[in-house]
């Protein structure tokens, strides 16, 4: 190659001198850059030394004609370079196409995977929407069920409150009735107490009447002692009175005994009535409780019926809901089957996608390996492409320059009509040069494929040229020939031009390599982000599938729970029916007990009415007895008044006759002798009658006291402390009455003793006075008169006795 270049240089020295006029302006336009293969400082100095004469030689070159043709060796080198660079660029383009196709296939697979993911998402969203709809329907059914439950509970509470209010009102009515009944019972007890008080008053009146009768008998006995004549008739009257009194006392005692027995019976009846009343109260309480229980049972039965109806309705509704739920469950099962199928399909797709992803990962790894290898190839091809592109750009610039020159030539044609021949020749030459340039462009394309070899050959040629240039410089320095200087300058210019071209090609190749590297990095980043998104979507799909499975399991659990609830409701309905039957049986039993208690109440009320009737009869009898006692008291008062009148009349008569018959004391001594016996007899009879009366009174008092003690013992439990004080006062009053009786007996005994003393003194004074027979006659006359008077008084008393009895 070096010999060829030397021969070419020797052959082309003459030609270059003619063609420098065309090349110099081209080379001056190219920007020079420092190269690694640049010459040493000695070479730079030689260049400076050579540049000075080149500046001097420029006008000579400018004066040359620009119509000199280009050398054929350069065109051959360019054609070789283009031919070498073209297959490399084709391979690089094919590799780029393959890489782009792989990237497009990856993007298509990525788009397919994204579409599948979108479809799976859509399916999952549809399944989730279906599940949400099912859950919403279930929630709505549960909310409706809870609302209905709440409404039923509120209605039950309101009904219970109303029934409680009604029961309270009924209880108040029953309490009012009970209060009224208790008030009536209190009135009855008060009436009974009043009756007992009246009985006690009657007993007191009876005792007072007896006391008065005793007083009257004693007074009568005293008057009989004083009145001798009326003693026999008074004895008769006393006997009659005693007989009547005895009869009355016997009748009264019998009545009192009967009344006592009846009172005892009445008290027993009262006790029985009270016990019956207590039992009745207890029965009433039991009946009230039973009524309350009945009402509660009825209410419970009505509630149970209502609840049973409601539960039946609810059971029907629940059955409907169960049917709907079963339908929904079937739909859900169908949808679940479809969803499971879809999930299986999606799972299979996911597995396929995962396998594809693994394959893609492997492919990506392989692609990365290939990309790494291709990067190296790309770097190399980019270097080649850069060189070829630089050359093509330079050729394009040259073509542009040629166009500009053509324009200038055309202008010169218009300006220089005189030089038509030169212009035509120059045009022909330019056309030939055009053809050559076109051929050179075609050859440059071919040379692009062979740029590597040319670069290597150029590098070796550069080294050789540099060595030769050094040698030539040395020779030129020694010789100082101008031809060699021009050749060296031309070589320097060619070397600079080639260096600039290769530097531009390298820069462009580096730039393209950087662009490709950035594109590859961006594709890597996009692929990594796509992988991350893919993994995130895979995780989201897995989570969504898990959530879907959990929701399906929860739906199954809720369906099972609803089935259990329906079973429980059925069991509760059966239990409620059983409770209703039991409540009905209990209600029947309670109704039977209530009927029995009502019958017992009626019987007790009838007995109480009978007892009240008996009490009324006894009260009427008691009132009649009291009325008879009042009549007897009136009779006694009348008899006492008559006795007092008779005694007063007798005393007046005795007082009148005593004055007249002072002289007849002797005649009446016998009578006075008889008077003590009569008085004693009358006193004995009086005492006996009084003792009998007192014994009878004591027996009656004992009976009454026993009856009173029995009644008091029975009534002590029910009486208050005030009643006890009344009893104490009554006993004190009786003791005072007894003491008065004893004092009265003592006083009467003292008066009798004084009368006896007076009689004894009169007997003693009779002999002292010296009564004669005339006095005795007068006494006998007085006795006869007294007898006549006593007879009249007896007849009057006999006449008045039956009248009073009538």
From Swiss-Prot:
Transit peptide segment: 1-78
Which residue stretches does the UniProt record annotate as biased composition, category Polar residues?
34-59, 759-769
Q: What is this protein called?
A: WEB family protein At3g02930, chloroplastic
Q: Which residues form a coiled coil?
A: 88-530, 585-662, 698-757
The record's similarity note reads: Belongs to the WEB family.
Give start-end positions of Basic and acidic residues composition bias.
391-403, 685-699, 706-725
One GO cellular-component annotation of the UniProt record comes to: endoplasmic reticulum
Report biased composition (Low complexity) as residue ranges. Answer: 9-22
Which PANTHER family does UniProt cross-reference here? SYNAPTONEMAL COMPLEX PROTEIN-RELATED (PTHR23160), WEB FAMILY PROTEIN (PTHR23160:SF16)
Q: Does the keyword Chloroplast apply?
A: yes
Q: Where is this region: Disordered?
A: 1-94, 380-403, 684-725, 746-777
Source organism per UniProt: Arabidopsis thaliana
UniProt keywords (A-Z) are: Chloroplast, Coiled coil, Plastid, Transit peptide
Cellular localization per UniProt: Plastid, Chloroplast
């Amino acid at each position: 190659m070096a010999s060829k270049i030397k021969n070419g240089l020797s052959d082309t020295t003459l030609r270059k001198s003619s063609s420098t006029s065309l090349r110099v302006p081209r080379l001056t336009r190219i920007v020079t850059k420092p190269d690694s293969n640049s010459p040493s400082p000695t070479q730079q100095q030689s260049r400076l030394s050579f540049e000075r004469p080149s500046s001097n030689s420029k006008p000579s070159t400018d004066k040359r004609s620009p119509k000199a043709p280009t050398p054929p060796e350069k065109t051959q080198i360019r054609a070789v370079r283009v031919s070498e660079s073209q297959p490399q660029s084709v391979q690089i383009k094919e590799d780029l196409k393959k890489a782009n196709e792989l990237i497009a296939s990856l993007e298509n697979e990525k788009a397919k995977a994204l579409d599948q993911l979108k479809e799976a998402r859509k399916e999952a969203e549809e399944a989730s929407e279906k599940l949400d709809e099912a859950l919403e329907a279930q929630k709505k059914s549960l909310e409706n069920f809870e609302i209905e439950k709440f409404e039923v509970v509120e209605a039950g509470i309101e009904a219970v409150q109303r029934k409680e209010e009604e029961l309270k009102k009924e209880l108040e009515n029953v309490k009012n009735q009970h209060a009224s009944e208790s008030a009536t019972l209190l009135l009855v007890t008060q009436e009974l107490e009043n009756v007992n008080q009246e009985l006690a008053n009657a007993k007191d009146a009876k005792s007072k009447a007896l006391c008065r009768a005793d007083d009257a008998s004693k007074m009568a006995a005293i008057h009989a002692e004083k009145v001798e004549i009326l003693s026999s008739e008074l004895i008769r009257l006393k006997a009659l009175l005693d007989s009547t009194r005895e009869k009355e006392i016997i009748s009264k005692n019998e009545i009192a005994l009967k009344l006592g027995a009846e009172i005892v019976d009445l008290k027993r009846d009262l006790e029985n009535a009270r016990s019956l009343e207590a039992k009745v109260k207890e029965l009433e309480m039991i009946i009230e409780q039973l009524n309350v229980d009945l009402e509660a049972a009825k209410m419970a039965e009505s509630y149970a019926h209502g609840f049973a109806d409601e539960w039946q309705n609810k059971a029907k509704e629940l059955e409907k809901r169960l049917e709907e739920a079963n339908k929904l469950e079937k739909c859900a099962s169908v949808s679940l089957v479809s969803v499971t199928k879809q999930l299986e399909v999606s799972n299979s797709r996911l597995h396929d996608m995962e396998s594809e992803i693994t394959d893609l990962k492997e492919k990506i790894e392989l692609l990365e390996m290939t990309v790494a290898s291709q990067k190296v190839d790309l770097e190399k091809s980019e270097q080649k492409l850069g060189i070829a592109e630089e050359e093509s750009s330079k050729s394009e610039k040259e073509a542009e320059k040629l166009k500009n020159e053509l324009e200038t030539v055309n202008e010169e044609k218009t300006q220089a009509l005189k030089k038509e021949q030169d212009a035509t020749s120059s045009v022909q030459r330019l056309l030939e040069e055009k053809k050559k340039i076109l051929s050179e462009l075609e050859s440059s394309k071919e040379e692009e494929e062979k740029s590597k070899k040319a670069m290597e050959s150029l590098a070796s040629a550069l080294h050789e040229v540099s060595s030769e240039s050094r040698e030539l410089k040395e020779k030129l320095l020694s010789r100082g020939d101008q031809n060699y200087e021009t050749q060296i300058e031309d070589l320097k210019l060619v070397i600079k031009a080639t260096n600039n071209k290769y530097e531009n090609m390298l820069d462009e190749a580096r730039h393209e390599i950087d662009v490709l590297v950035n594109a590859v990095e961006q594709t890597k980043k996009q692929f990594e982000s796509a992988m991350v998104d893919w993994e995130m979507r895979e995780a989201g799909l897995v989570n969504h599938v898990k959530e879907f499975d959990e929701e399906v399991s929860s739906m199954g659990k809720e369906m099972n729970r609803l089935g259990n609830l329906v079973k429980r409701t059925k069991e509760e309905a059966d239990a409620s029916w059983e409770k209703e039957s039991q409540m009905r049986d209990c209600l029947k039993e309670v109704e039977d007990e209530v009927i029995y208690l009502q019958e017992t109440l009626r019987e007790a009320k009838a007995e109480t009415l009978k007892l009240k009737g008996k009490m009324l009869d006894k009260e009427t009898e008691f009132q009649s007895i009291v009325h008879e006692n009042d009549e007897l008291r009136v009779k006694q008062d009348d008899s006492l008044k008559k006795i007092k009148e008779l005694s007063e009349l007798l005393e007046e008569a005795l007082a009148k006759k005593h004055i007249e018959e002072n002289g007849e004391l002797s005649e009446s001594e016998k009578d006075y002798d008889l008077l003590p016996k009569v008085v004693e007899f009358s006193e004995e009879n009086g005492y006996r009658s009084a003792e009998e009366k007192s014994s009878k009174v004591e027996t009656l008092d004992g009976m009454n006291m026993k009856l009173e003690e029995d009644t008091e013992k029975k009534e002590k439990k029910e009486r208050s402390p005030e009643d006890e004080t009344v009893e104490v006062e009554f006993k004190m009053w009786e003791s005072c009455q007894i003491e008065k009786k004893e004092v009265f007996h003592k006083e009467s005994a003292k008066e009798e003793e004084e009368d006896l003393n007076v009689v004894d003194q009169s007997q003693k004074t009779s002999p002292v006075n010296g009564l004669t027979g005339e006095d005795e006659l007068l006494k006998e006359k007085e006795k006869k008169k007294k007898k006549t008077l006593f007879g009249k008084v007896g007849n009057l008393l006999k006449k008045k006795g039956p009248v009073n009895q009538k």
